[in-house]
Amino acid sequence: MAGIGVKLNNIYGKNTLTTDVIGMGYSTVMTIAPMLTVIGALCIMEYFLDFSSVGYVTRELFSCTVLYIFIFALLTASPFNSVLSKYMSDVIYEETYADIMACYYVGLFLNILLSSLVGIPFCIHEYLVGKVDIIYVFTGYCGFIALVFVFYSMLYLSICKDYKKISFFFIIGMTVTVLLSFWFVRGLHKSITYSMLLALTIGFWLIAALEFSVVRSYFRENSGNYRAVFGYFKEYWPLVTTNFLYTLGLYIHNFVFWTTDLRMIVVRSFVCVQPYDMATCLAMFTNISASVIFISRVEMHFHERYKAYSEAVIGGRGCDIEITKKRMFRMLAEELMSLARVQFIITLVIFLFCMIFLPRLGFGGMTMRIYPCLTAGYFILFLMYAEIIFLYYFNDLKGSVMTALSFCLSTMIGSIISTHFSEIWYGIGLVVGCFVGWSVAYARIRNMEKNLDIHIFCNGHLLKRTKGTCPSPKVFDRYQGDTEERMKES
């Protein structure tokens, strides 16, 4: 995010309302440009291919297929990405770049394996129980795997800071998708929904191929050191847990409402609650720019203070360590407050825009009644995510797991309770869950501030840990001379 960070800091550095709005637009577009491209392609296909003329069940089958492809592609990728990012950061620091492709192939294998374990049983159920045509089912599965591939390769392009290429590849892929869908319907006279699904699948595979080609162009050598990657999963399992619980928490409130009487079941396989799911999508888009704003500002500001503190720990005086520590935590507090201030302006502007114009575009009723509460929830959620990033900086993996677990469980319990409330309070479960997670993370950061010296200087071990019999505590015998263990060491 360094390139984006420089641009954003030039914008926000003027500290005016106008520049905040400009920064809002820039960060939002850079963050969700790929998603906007996909949504735009779907809207174009639905409008020009007369999607509304298709039967209701067929339309809902297509909509639910696309919804499930996106949600579960994110969920199945979440356990691996954080550990792989950690491994690649260490590899880049050590300048052993040949290990990156080994990491890429291991991560890709794990992603595809988990996605297949989730997707294949569902597809079998969809075919046998839902009586959906097997070609349609297989095409949907291919689209799911392709999107998993796309999301996974985006991780490596982000490390290479090729954010513009990611957006460019999505534009190419979705342009091909739209053109192919027209050809399938007008030229080959295929059904509208299957043509759209097939074209979307081909578009995803094209994006995945383009991303893979760029990754291969950057990292041509493969060390074959696959075992080291698996070792990281064993050592940094808290990262796996944190990322999975955080991603699950993003959608667990949807899953709770999918069990209520509001749910709609399509072909005895897909479950959804359209008004709530749409409100969730709008609320997430309203606040998603917070992530890129925060990460870019951390790289440009807090990271420098963190680096100065680390250098003081390595070779500075006691007073230098104390001064740099205070400056670092002062910057941490400033960044959290700045994020809250800027994101509040962004959220408020987008929220007012949605409340005024979306009803004119057909969004209304229950969706717009649920939307405000969910917007507040996602506002707190991205502030909580910022705190998790800070916990990563201080290697507080236990705190990050506690934060993600409390967030996920509180959101689930709160959502179960909120199903008995009126529509306007349906999103209160997410608000409560995010606030609980934010509070846990804040408490861990304050505890880290008070006990940072203990965390830094008292977590090492004077003796190397090994497995085996415990050596004799006797290091010297005045009557026998050196002990047997000392003689072996010498």
Specify the residue positions occupied by each region the protein language model found:
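Hydrophobic faces of transmembrane alpha-helices in multi-pass small-molecule transporters and flippases
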Residues: 20-32, 36, 167, 225-252, ...
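Alpha-helical transmembrane segments of multi-pass membrane proteins
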Residues: 67-72, 109-113, 121-156, 345-350, ...
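Alpha-helical transmembrane segments of multi-pass membrane transporters/permeases
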Residues: 157-183, 391-413
